[in-house]
Amino acid sequence: MIRRSAVSRVVAEGSAIASDSGFALGASQYDAVVLLSFGGPEGPEDVVPFLKKVTSGRGVPDERLYEVAEHYNHFSGISPINDCNRRLRGALEKELFSRGIRIPVLWANRNWQPQLEEVLREAYDRGFRAFLTLFTSAYSCYSSCRQYREDIAHAVERAGLSGRIIVDKLRQFFDHPGFVLPFIEGIQDCLEQVKERGFKVSRTAILFSTHSIPELDAAFSGPEDAHFGKYGAYVSQHKAVVEVIMSRLRVTDPDLQNYQLVYQSRSGDPSTPWLEPDINDAIRVLRGCEAVLIVPLGFISDHMEVLWDLDNESMQTARECGLFAIRTPTPGTHPLYISGMVDLIVERLEGVPRSARPAMTDLGPWFDVCQPGCCKNSRSGFKPAYGGVAP
């Protein structure tokens, strides 16, 4: 039996109306949590098919595709994101069980095995009817939220489960303490290493790196009627978190003044404007610095964009510029991060009101339910999506 809370859930665009406030009203019951991620190849034979699936219709040149394939081949064709998600799934379930919450955590991907439609179908056959999804992306934009929601709608339809199950989503957690505090801790630890090596904090640059996206996607990120500036909620959320982190760091290190938000891992049509500056360009123009501290602020785990684009390419750029470089850890399975993500789940299970939800910036806490037009696709137009208010 499908169990509903005080708010009517949106099971697809156009099928139901949710809370006008964007926040779920009242407690909800779920049969499982779904950790929903991007996916990645599990062996050399998977690499090119995976990349072609991911880049289909995006105008990515073949030479770029095969360049990225070589990155995976350095890891024997296995994406590190898979083991990261296996560990994350296990840690989340363990934390839930430790709190007496007997809800299983399932792992599913948008672009590779285990495919979401298969996971939902198998869960349905086990008697599960209500699902709460946790996306492995903290911020708001098409590729990190709306596309997940569209893929849920597509997976439910392909699984033949339309109208039979409920799939809700957790809020974006960019400013939740469980996500932000591990970064602060990691930066503080790395700054100690910088000092131990004899470098001055006043001559250390901190580069907060996140995934670049097309400028138009950035402009459309967030609620349609919000006013976040030229690059939308995506950039505003990142900048707000950066300022919170820096304000904490300068309490003990007031000489920390050189920092900026940078971007990485762009792809797609080379003629399409993407967010800049690229991290490598930013490193090359640093002046008066001895060291650079790289913070992967846009990522929750050590997947390919972190291990290759940062640990390989950006570190090499720093060496070429004569700079000492160090990268902070991603949240991964940090206890604060795991506890924070379970707190998000509890918010929905217990119906925690917005006023009682933690957020470290003035932008949060973010919405449970997306509004019409939120993070719309600038290229392919409207598609049905779960977890949003019907237009």
UniProtKB/Swiss-Prot annotation:
Residues bound to Fe-coproporphyrin III: 79, 148
Pathway membership: Porphyrin-containing compound metabolism; protoheme biosynthesis
GO MF, any single term: metal ion binding
Gene3D superfamilies in UniProt: 3.40.50.1400
GO CC entries: cytoplasm
Pfam family, one: Ferrochelatase
GO biological process terms on file: heme biosynthetic process
NCBIfam families on file: PRK00035.2-1
Task of the protein: Involved in coproporphyrin-dependent heme b biosynthesis. Catalyzes the insertion of ferrous iron into coproporphyrin III to form Fe-coproporphyrin III.
Family recorded in the similarity comment: Belongs to the ferrochelatase family.
Protein name per Swiss-Prot or TrEMBL: Coproporphyrin III ferrochelatase
Record organism: Tropheryma whipplei (strain Twist)
